[in-house]
Amino acid sequence: MDWQFIGYIAFTYLFASIPFGYVIGKLFGKDITKEGSGNIGATNVTRTIGKKAGILVLILDLLKGFIPVYYAKYLFFDTKHIAIVALAAVIGHCFSIFMKFKGGKGVATGFGVLIAISGKVALITFLIWLGTFLVSGYVSLASIISASLSWVMIFYLEIGRAHV
């Protein structure tokens, strides 16, 4: 590994560690870690502050996965390096240095990674999430099922490409 790549991994981890749910909660005068489920993610922000704040957190958390992986595809090219960047983004979100190594569940950030890797698989994953949510009414169940199936789809729909 070269120093440029190591620096990019450190940048990705720190960028993904920004606790947008916590920051937005504070802007609304709330400590999101002490409200609702205590999670800093979009679902808890939506429940405790409102839809607009929740959507903002969702988009910002999604970008924490999308931006580093999208640019990694052009900086490093090979699947191994891109996968390490993706992992650094999700780890940064879930174990934020700014939150004493606590964080969100990684669903939105992981979905941002997925969009950067394969828009086709991301769209199918979103449709699975939406269908599961509409049938069950549970964000958590929809997230678990769609996230589990997304990596199966990556394997079967994207395997054999020169790079992700």
Where are these regions (language model features)?
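Cytosolic, membrane-interface loops and tails of multi-pass inner-membrane proteins
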Residues: 22-54
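Membrane-helix interface segments
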Residues: 2-5, 51-53, 77-82, 105-107, ...
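Membrane-helix interface "capping/anchor" motifs
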Residues: 99-102, 131-145
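Interfacial segments of multi-pass membrane proteins
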Residues: 46-49, 72-75, 107-136, 148-158
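Conserved small/polar residues in nucleotide/adenosyl-binding loops
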Residues: 162-164
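Alpha-helical transmembrane segments in multi-pass membrane proteins
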Residues: 8, 12-13, 17, 21, ...
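Mid-bilayer segments of alpha-helical transmembrane spans in multi-pass integral membrane proteins
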Residues: 94-98, 118
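Helix-boundary and loop/linker segments of multi-pass membrane transporters
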Residues: 1, 43-47, 75, 102
